[in-house]
Amino acid sequence: NNGFMLCAWYRGTPSLPSALAAAYGVVMASEEDPARPLNTLALPGIAVCASKDKTLRSEQESALYNGVAPVETGADGTTARIVRAITTYVVSSNGTADESLLDVTTVRTLIYVSRAITQRIALRFPREKLNDKTAQRVRSELIDVLMRCEELEILEHVEANLDKLLVERDSQNP
């Protein structure tokens, strides 16, 4: 149950689990857009399973429901393809069903935006004095980063949610 762990499943493949993990990593690393789904992408170098080992759609759905990312043989019969890239995160810390970090694209998008924000703040405010004007300048930079992410179609509805973006001094660590 981890938003940063992916468990791929391809029944009957003669390829080693480590090769399947490596192929998945190659596909994820080669995709520049963190928000673009990886569904149907081929896993290079993975041997296809025998037809008797192919998974049924109901088995794939069960795997997905339980935080396992199934792989299937493509229509051409020669390539292993991602069904849906998900993490093992299926329940929150209090034990209730939670899909918030299930899709790999969600986690990759969060990481991308977080790094973009961190890099911008480090670039614009490397040795900034903390005063009452700083918070508004930081907020302005954050809005710019978020709007650029929306232009790249990584985020949606940024302007509609700007009222929820709070930048304030920490009263316990002024």
Residue positions per predicted region:
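Strand-loop microenvironment adjacent to phosphate/nucleotide-handling motifs in alpha/beta enzyme folds
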Residues: 1-26
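Structured, hydrophobic secondary-structure cores that serve as assembly/anchoring elements
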Residues: 14, 28-174
